[in-house]
Amino acid sequence: MEYAGKDAQLWAAIGREEQRQEGTIELIASENIVSKEVAAAQGSVLTNKYAEGYPGKRYYGGCQFIDQVEQLAIDHAKELFGAAYANVQPHSGSQANMAVYQALLKPGDTILGMGMDAGGHLTHGSKVNFSGKLYHTYGYELSPETEELDYDAILAQAKEIQPQLIVAGASAYSQIIDWDKFRQIADEVGAYLMVDMAHIAGLVATGYHPNPVPVADVVTTTTHKTLRGPRGGMILSKSEELGKKLNSAVFPGTQGGPLEHVIAGKAQAFYEDLQPAFKDYIGQVVKNAAAMAEVFNESETIRVVTGGTANHLLVLDLTKTGLTGKDAQALLDSVMITTNKEAIPNDQRSPFVTSGLRVGTPAITSRGFKEDDAKQVASLIIKALDNADDQTILAEVKEAVHALTQAHPVD
């Protein structure tokens, strides 16, 4: 598209990024490809409008149509997850989490969340994050034997530290999470239960993972990842009464004017998520991840953490390859496969290096990849990592990647 007075360097960079996305197999589990309708809504004239407040209660005039847009997003979100309350204004998942902490806690209170090397997120209590600076935070780990959540150990830890808030949910955990067991743990120690379902929200919406909304006090999520919406955040609850505190924590507590053009993109994405085709899509995401796990499990050098996956992602232990996660990520980048380095349970390397990779199937599934394609991608990863110094083989992998991306263009 041509624009008068455009910044040529900017648009050249955007064009190169478009080419990169077209020519790359995208396996970062938190990335996806939005529809043209979502992109159009986000690029609409709503970006011009300031709208501090909430529908029907704004601090600016001229918000009558903005109110309609935001209310649609709220209504679609509530229907999608069976929630009594939804706030679609958080700019990100991190800001959604921050707002919940502000609503439920006071500085110095104690949070028990998933440890980073167990698959948790920065905002679940990392000492370099606001969550670890404003609150006393502790991380629960995985069972050394199964590499899955050990609910008895989490209960024992909760009894010991007596947290005011327990955070369930992960950014790199491949198995089903038992929300009811977390509810029992929280009730036993008198804590609030917050679920961060950012990664699995699309699976929850379609029944491929149990729904935490009826169980938890508060649920947060991003709106991209498996929901295929714009980058943003959202807060859900079964309690309208608690929703009043949450609204105040978002605005004016942690944010000013909402990004209504992004909220329009959220509304469009949620509308798409309510259609039958979205359930088919998520089903294929899960099948593709399982197909990749099957291939990786046959490798002599790559180990799948937990032995498999029940959702959209896998964590790969690269110890036997002799490569760090950082090295493997760079190597795969060179053959046009995009992944991210990831800590494995009890990883001794720093988060900037790691001993593993995280791979996910949302983006390739949006491009129409099926199980056989996913298996081929896994085989190409193994081939590349097992032959890291062989430029001839790496060139073969890159050529095969090119063929796959040509066969499955970004719509």
UniProtKB/Swiss-Prot annotation:
GO MF term list: glycine hydroxymethyltransferase activity; pyridoxal phosphate binding
A cellular-component GO term for this protein: cytosol
Keyword Lyase: no
Cofactor(s) needed by this chain: pyridoxal 5'-phosphate
UniProt-listed InterPro entries: PyrdxlP-dep_Trfase (IPR015424), PyrdxlP-dep_Trfase_major (IPR015421), PyrdxlP-dep_Trfase_small (IPR015422), Ser_HO-MeTrfase (IPR001085), Ser_HO-MeTrfase-like (IPR049943), Ser_HO-MeTrfase_PLP_BS (IPR019798), SHMT-like_dom (IPR039429)
Compartments reported by the entry: Cytoplasm
Site location (Plays an important role in substrate specificity): 224
EC number(s) given by UniProt: 2.1.2.1
Predominant location: cytoplasm
Metabolic or biological pathway: One-carbon metabolism; tetrahydrofolate interconversion; Amino-acid biosynthesis; glycine biosynthesis; glycine from L-serine: step 1/1
One GO process term, biological-process aspect: glycine biosynthetic process from serine
Membership in a protein family: Belongs to the SHMT family.
Subunit relationships: Homodimer.
Protein name, UniProt field: Serine hydroxymethyltransferase
